[in-house]
A protein has these predicted regions:
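Non-catalytic surface loops within mature trypsin-like serine protease
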Residues: 12, 57, 79-81, 114, ...
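Generic secondary-structure microfeatures
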Residues: 24, 47-49, 55-58, 79-81
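Vicinal oxygen chelate
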Residues: 2-12, 42-46, 51-53, 63-139
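A cross-kingdom feature marking solvent-exposed beta-strand/loop segments within repeated
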Residues: 35-36, 58-64, 71-73, 94-96, ...
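Loop/turn position at the start of each blade in beta-propeller repeats
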Residues: 1, 38, 70, 103-105
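Amide-forming acyltransferase catalytic core, primarily the GNAT-like/NAT-type
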Residues: 28-36, 40-44, 56-62, 139
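Long, hydrophobic N-terminal alpha-helical segment
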Residues: 1-38
Length: 139
């Protein structure tokens, strides 16, 4: 397990773009993608890939839960297998199945403990060039 990112919920794509440009001095355009299971769109900063911007859809539970505020929402750890997220237990997971997310990630959340929301992230398998069946490769 290793640190992957922090997720910041912001009110809109324009707020995320402004934060990136003005505060992080990252002028690369954010590339947004949907996470349908969580009713939101997300993007990672090019310059600071450890920061994820989350913009919930109007009907998302995040809007009701957070009252429309911009907040630090979660911390995420990369694990080998999101269904068996060692050192955590599968019984600690909120959802029965992981959700597909941007950049080929699979994600799930652990049941909150003392208010801290933790996401577990499984990165896509990379293939070795010239050997499409080999894990750890580059296609």
């Amino acid at each position: 397990m290793r640190f992957h990112h922090v997720g910041m919920v912001v009110r809109s794509v324009s707020v995320a773009n402004e934060l990136c440009l003005e505060r992080l001095k990252d002028d690369a355009p954010l590339v947004w993608g949907p996470v349908l299971a969580f009713q939101c769109v997300v993007a990672f900063s090019e310059k600071f890939p450890m920061i994820e911007f989350v913009v919930p859809e109007a009907e998302s539970r995040l809007v009701t839960f957070l009252g429309g505020k911009s907040v630090l929402h979660h911390i995420a750890f990369a694990v080998e297998d999101v269904r068996r997220p060692a050192p955590f237990s599968a019984g600690d997971l909120i959802f029965d199945e992981p959700a597909p997310a941007v950049r080929g990630l699979l994600v799930n959340f652990l049941k909150p403990f003392e208010g801290l929301l933790v996401e577990v992230v499984q990165e896509p398998v990379k293939r070795v060039a010239g050997n499409p069946t080999s894990p750890g490769s580059l296609d």
